[in-house]
Amino acid sequence: MSPLSEYALRMSRLSARIFGEVARSTDSKSMKVVSLFSEQPLAKKKETYDWYPNHNTYFALMGNLRFLGLYRDEHQDFKDEQRRLKKLRGKGKPRKGEGKRATKKK
């Protein structure tokens, strides 16, 4: 069998570059690096990003259950109570346009 022509070699290298293959044969250490880079990144693997539940969904669902009275979140109850007491003392957030900077200008 005749060796590949120069054109065929160039086309095979170009094809390898286009399709993400190794263009020229290398030793096993380099091939290990190539295989590591060809794998999917750790953050894109399903077992990594599916490890924890979807917190936004759970937070919204628990908020709805709390609103309906089917779930009691003591920490949120405490925060609401503190906010209510703060407002009773007149320490609530000022309305828009009534902050410290707005009163300085007038």
Swiss-Prot record:
Residues 84-94 have a biased composition (Basic residues). It comes from Mus musculus. This is Small ribosomal subunit protein mS33. The keyword Mitochondrion applies. Component of the mitochondrial ribosome small subunit (28S) which comprises a 12S rRNA and about 30 distinct proteins. One of its GO terms (biological process) is mitochondrial translation. One of its GO terms (cellular component) is mitochondrial inner membrane. Residues 95-106 have a biased composition (Basic and acidic residues). It is found in: Mitochondrion. Keywords: Acetylation, Mitochondrion, Ribonucleoprotein, Ribosomal protein. Residues 81-106 are annotated as: Disordered.
